[in-house]
Amino acid sequence: NTGIGYSALLANTAANNTAVGSNALAANTTGTRNVAFGYAALDANTTASYNSAFGTFSLSDNTTGANNTALGYYALAVNTTASDNTAVGYQALGANTSGTRNTATGRSALTTATTGDDNTGLGYYALVSATTASDNTAVGSSAMENATTGYANTAVGKDAAKQLTTSYGNTVMGFQAGQAITTGNGGNVIIGWQAGQRITTGETNIVIGKKALEENLTGGNNVAVGYNALGDVTSSANTGVGHEVMAVTSTGEANTGMGFRALKANTTASYNTAVGHSALTTNTTGAQNTAIGQGAMNDNTTGSYNVAVGVSAFTTNTTGSENTAVGFEALKAATTADNNVAIGRLAGVGLTTGGGNTILGAAALQTMTTGSSIVAIGLSTLASATGGSHTAVGYQAGLDITTAVQGTYLGYQAGANLTTGNNNVAVGYGSLSTCTTGS
């Protein structure tokens, strides 16, 4: 067969059909390899076979399904009963009934597809209010524009998961990315440009680039990786990773930082950890800090249960709390200290101002400024201490104390050239090592 006009293949009894115009395959019986081009195209073809149909009403109420493809105007116009659909333009899957393997490419794409199955979208309105959705993918323009009712979603560009309703497995990729995902139990992973763009309502977020978790609504188990990372996160189990990391976290929770500006001015704190570059960059307001490298506790505000580990370690912390600082510049000019312990390299370096100090190695209490209950244990120990209630234990012990007060110095060079007196005691090896000047 081929048939060209008016009622075209009017109730033909099969073989290899093609039909071109008016009512095209007008109620063809019994199917086979159909193609039909125009006006009512596959006009209620019965009983189906391998369909294709190109224009006007295209698969116009085809019965009963099979391997459909349809191209323009009303495309899969209310196809019944479905099969392996593809539809390309204008109203694309025009309220297809009932679902199966769908793909639709342009304009209104999955125009209110009914009833779901394996959807893919692609352009302009993409999954335009797919009802009742299924295993969705949607690629461009308005991507998942108000998909209803969700499911295993993926959406790639422009407005990506644009107000997806009602959520589920989400993965979202570009431009306005998570654009206000709605509603719950979404497994979110969201990748670029405006990334988490006010996710609603949260769930298990991981977000990777540009403005990352920008003003996230409402929380979830966040991780966000680059540029503005956890940008104004409100809140939940946060982790950051790079560039501005916690860029003004609001409001706290289980924070971790990691790179460049780490906990950049996080407010209001919680269980912080921050790892590199500027680490706890002027964190506000304190809580259970740990900070590990480069700027470590870079001017942390306001204190709490601090530990800081390397490079500039306790860099001019403000305002104190129960400090420990471990390496290189250790308690570097701590302000305003508290129950200090400092362990290596320059240990107490220029400590300001006091606390329960115990300081263990390298240059130990290196020219303390204003002490407290001081003990300093190894290498240069009290290296040129000025004032305080000393105890010092090993190697150069009281090394050139200035200006001494209570003393006690126990081993190796003990009182090492002590300067200037007070209540000294020195016990071992070099003990009062030709003391200068007594008491």
Feature locations, PLM:
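Glycine- and small/polar-enriched repetitive beta-structure motifs of secreted/surface proteins
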Residues: 1-439
